[in-house]
């Protein structure tokens, strides 16, 4: 007997429909799975056989052929266990025909318990778009799958395959999954507060500008000057995630298997801090099975690279595509996958190998050539993509004990949100599709948006000639100055905005 059960698979960040076709016929007992299955899918034959018997059903000891259509797309993971079990029960006459508008996802334990699987949200979204009315998933995946509810689709969470069978028979209906309320502003309370940071007024100001305009930042300073402390607090002053950003970020974490069980949409902007020993594959993603890397896991959030020169040159070069295009493509012999990687880069480095070059009280043990060699590990093309660079000096005793209290994250966030509101209104006009903040402006858009006072234009001309600026550096300065002006509520860029933008140039601060 022949039967079909519907399921879904993953291709990059998108789900696609899979038909699990099962045919039980006469002949010597055999169990074959075709349709480009990987090893996890092929192993499902043993899991399904044990689960059927342990649930009290009879395994059909006949010739079984299972096809996963479309047969030209590779199928990965244990997500097809549940639909395969149901297809065999139907094909062997132990279960009535399954509705054509129902789909099933889930891994099976040997006793028939359903285990959670990765990538449920993108598969659930694909199910809703393809007209599925009932989606059965493991209970631990119900919260994320429920985010795809709409257009008539209902998500049913189950803990065992027996529950699914009983629901299909009408014996014991399953209660639909509830959608968890999405409140991104609650996430701010989980981020450390800027009020804890004493001193470092220039670096704090740079972080506000970075948050307001979406700019990348490089912090240079000796150990203990607060570089990591500032970076970890940046998500607390960034705007809240929009629902579209939250869905995209949740899809990435779901595919990577890093979404906490029982969790709906990701509500906090990600903060990723990979160790400097991370390989290029760890940053870009990939592997035997396509998985997002750190660049994609930081999507819509912050990627913090501490000890920047200690990363391998190969790893740092990986950053160029996502910084330029906002996405990263991973290619392997089995195919390719593209993941969004629109992160804000915050990098930190010591001024030299020992960390004390230029320190007011500690002696640097590095030779001038060693300092140059250390700093040259950060390539020029990468520096070209960093808008703000700050040198952080050690904090004096008086700053720690007598300085006025620092502004809190809530106060700084008000400034950032006001500047972002100005940008949102500005870039709602035709011709700015896909632009959300100043850092995303193209060269042509910079000339349209960054209009200056006559005095500011004279200052920029003089600086361009005196400093030998490139065209890219010229545009980068204008983008930062535009953000400074937005924070001040000014329409034209004045001398103050340009002077502040000029002091954050990275090239001279890294070169010795």
Descriptions of predicted regions:
Residues 34, 40-45, 60, 67-77, ...:
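Basic, amphipathic alpha-helical bundle interface domains used for macromolecular binding and assembly
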Residues 111, 305-312, 355:
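Catalytic P-loop NTPase motifs of RecA-like helicase/translocase cores
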Residues 219-260:
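Walker A/P-loop
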Residues 244, 251-283:
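Clamp-loader machinery-focused feature within the broader ASCE/P-loop NTPase space
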Residues 1-218, 222, 228, 331, ...:
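Peripheral, non-AAA+ core regions of ATP-driven protein-machinery
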Residues 208, 265, 270, 280-303, ...:
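Conserved alpha-helical scaffold flanking the Walker A/P-loop in AAA+ ATPase domains
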Residues 300, 306-307, 318:
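Walker B catalytic acidic pair
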